């Protein structure tokens, strides 16, 4: 067993226990990338994204094409990041408008 065995599960468990405050920005991005990049160390990729774009906010604002300019970021990772960003914007917009959706079929 290597030192990195179980790393992903430990990171997921820490997030479930403690939330985002237990993580630096690149660490949150690293955990997100677990779901799009199953067999690579996502820590250096997360660092590369933050380094290229300057901040987590800028990473989330980047287009999939811009994200894919970072080595090892392919369509799955860029789509996941763009999807998380879109979901966040949609939720914030709904919260700001005071809109409450009880039944999505009613729209």
Question: Can you describe what each PLM-predicted range is?
Answer:
Residues 1-32:
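Charged, compositionally biased N-terminal leader segments and the immediate start
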Residues 3, 7, 41, 100-104:
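Catalytic cores of large soluble enzymes that bind and process phosphate-bearing ligands
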Residues 20, 49, 56-71:
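A short amphipathic alpha-helix within small helical-bundle interaction modules
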Residues 27-33, 46-49, 81-84:
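Short alpha-helical scaffolding segments that buttress acidic/His motifs in well-ordered protein cores
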Residues 33-60:
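Short, contiguous, well-ordered secondary-structure segments
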Residues 88, 92-107:
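Long, charged amphipathic helices and adjacent flexible linkers at domain junctions
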């Amino acid at each position: 067993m290597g030192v990195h065995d179980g790393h992903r599960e430990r990171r997921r468990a820490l997030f479930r226990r403690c939330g985002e405050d237990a993580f630096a920005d690149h660490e949150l991005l690293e955990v997100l990338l677990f779901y799009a990049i199953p067999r690579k160390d996502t820590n250096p990729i997360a660092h590369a994204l933050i380094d290229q774009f300057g901040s987590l906010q800028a990473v989330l604002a980047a287009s999939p094409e811009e994200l894919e300019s970072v080595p090892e970021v392919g369509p799955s990772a860029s789509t996941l990041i763009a999807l998380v960003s879109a979901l966040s914007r949609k939720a914030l917009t709904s919260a700001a408008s005071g809109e409450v959706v009880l039944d999505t079929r009613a729209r």
